[in-house]
Amino acid sequence: MTNPRETIPPGNSGEETIEEAFDWLDRTVEAINREAVNHLPRELIFQVWQRSWRYWHDEQGMSRSYTKYRYLCLMQKAVFMHFKKGCTCRGEGHGPGGWRSGPPPPPPPGLV
């Protein structure tokens, strides 16, 4: 995953469109998922996605993009805390499925 500080989110120059902002959000969510799956259990990623969707989209009535944004914030915090606690898997990762043995569950819907 590239350094997130190097990525300037859309909207800072005033020339971006809403569609570009949504594309940026989708790319960033996919990138954090690709990194997180190497460090966190797939069940955790799946549950955070499902619960974010259920709460923000279904219960609160927020848009899809807002739900993805809230999910992105949670996953960034989870990956940050994992690294802060001394992750030694920066190069190789924990392998597919994080710490779980056996076949991995399906990835979050729409984020394959």
From Swiss-Prot:
A motif (Nuclear localization signal) lies at residues 65-72. It is found in: Virion; Host nucleus. The keyword Transmembrane does not apply. Pfam families: VPR. Keywords: AIDS, Host nucleus, Host-virus interaction, Inhibition of host innate immune response by virus, Viral immunoevasion, Virion. Residues 61-80 are annotated as: Binds to human NUP153. GO terms for biological process: symbiont-mediated suppression of host innate immune response; viral life cycle. This is Protein Vpx. It comes from Human immunodeficiency virus type 2 subtype A (isolate SBLISY) (HIV-2). The lineage of its organism: Viruses, Riboviria, Pararnavirae, Artverviricota, Revtraviricetes.
